[in-house]
C-alpha cells in the first residue's frame, strides 16, 4: 500500500481513493519506530540493474516478459538468473504498439495477451514520460486491468508526486491505479522472492 499526503489535508492511498485527514503523526514519531540496526546501505543501482530485478521477479512469479529489444543486451546477468523475453507484443494492442513497446518492463499472463503489470524505470529521464506512456495506454485500451508502477530512487519521489497530481492524470483515473516503487523496495522484493524459489 502506498500513502501520499498532498499538503492540503487530503490523504491519498493508491488503489483506495482519497480521504480527509483527521489526525497527524509526525515524521519524527515514525523515525522513532524504526530500528536503525536493521537499516542497510544499498549500492547505487543502474537503470538496467533495476530492469533486471523487475524482469526476474516477473519470471519467478510465472509471467511472460517484455523488455524493449534495445535494452535486453544491457541487462545485468551478474545480478540475476537469465530469463526469457517475448520477441513480440500481442497484436491486440497494434493501434498503440509504438507506446507499449517502449515500456521498460511488462509482465503478461503466461501464454496470453493479457497485460498484468507495467513498470517504467525513471533513472534519469523525466518522470512524466513514463506517466504519459501509461496514460496513453490506459485511455486507449478500455477495461485494462493492469498495475502501473513508476520505479525510481527515493530522491525522485517528490518529482513523481508533482507530476502524478497533474489534472490530466487525475481526470483519466491513472492517479488512482499507478504507484511509485523505490529501488530499495524492488531490490528487497527481488531478494524475498528469490529466496522462496
Regions picked out by a protein language model, each given a short descriptive name:
Residues 2-5, 65-68, 150:
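A structural signal for short, well-ordered beta-strand segments and their strand-loop junctions
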Residues 11-16, 154-197:
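Domain-level recognition of nuclease-like catalytic cores that cleave nucleotide substrates
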Residues 1-36:
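Internal, Lys/Arg-enriched amphipathic helical interaction segments that engage polyanionic partners
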Residues 49-63, 108-127:
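Short, solvent-exposed linear motifs at loop/edge-of-secondary-structure regions
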Residues 26-70, 95-96:
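Nuclease catalytic cores
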Residues 43, 59, 67-113, 194-195:
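Active-site metal-binding core of divalent-cation-utilizing nuclease and nuclease-like domains
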Residues 92, 98-103, 112-176:
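Catalytic cores of nucleic-acid endonucleases
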Amino acid at each position: 500500500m502506498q500513502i501520499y499526503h498532498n499538503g492540503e489535508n487530503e490523504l491519498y492511498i493508491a488503489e483506495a481513493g482519497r480521504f480527509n485527514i483527521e489526525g497527524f503523526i509526525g515524521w519524527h514519531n515514525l523515525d522513532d519506530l524504526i530500528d536503525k540496526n536493521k537499516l542497510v546501505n544499498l549500492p547505487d543501482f543502474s537503470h538496467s540493474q533495476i530492469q533486471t530485478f523487475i524482469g526476474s521477479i516477473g519470471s519467478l512469479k510465472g509471467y511472460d516478459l517484455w523488455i524493449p529489444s534495445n535494452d535486453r543486451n544491457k541487462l545485468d546477468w551478474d545480478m540475476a538468473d537469465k530469463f526469457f523475453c517475448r520477441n513480440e507484443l500481442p497484436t491486440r494492442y497494434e493501434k498503440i504498439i509504438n507506446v507499449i513497446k517502449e515500456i521498460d518492463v511488462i509482465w503478461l499472463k503466461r501464454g496470453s495477451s493479457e497485460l498484468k503489470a507495467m513498470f517504467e524505470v525513471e533513472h534519469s529521464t523525466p518522470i512524466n514520460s513514463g506517466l504519459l506512456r501509461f496514460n496513453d495506454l490506459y485511455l486507449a485500451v478500455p477495461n485494462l486491468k493492469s498495475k502501473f508502477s513508476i520505479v525510481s530512487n527515493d530522491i525522485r519521489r517528490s518529482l513523481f508526486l508533482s507530476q502524478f497530481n497533474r489534472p490530466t492524470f487525475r481526470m483519466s483515473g491513472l492517479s488512482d491505479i499507478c504507484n511509485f516503487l523505490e529501488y530499495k523496495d524492488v531490490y528487497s522484493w527481488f531478494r524475498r522472492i528469490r529466496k522462496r524459489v
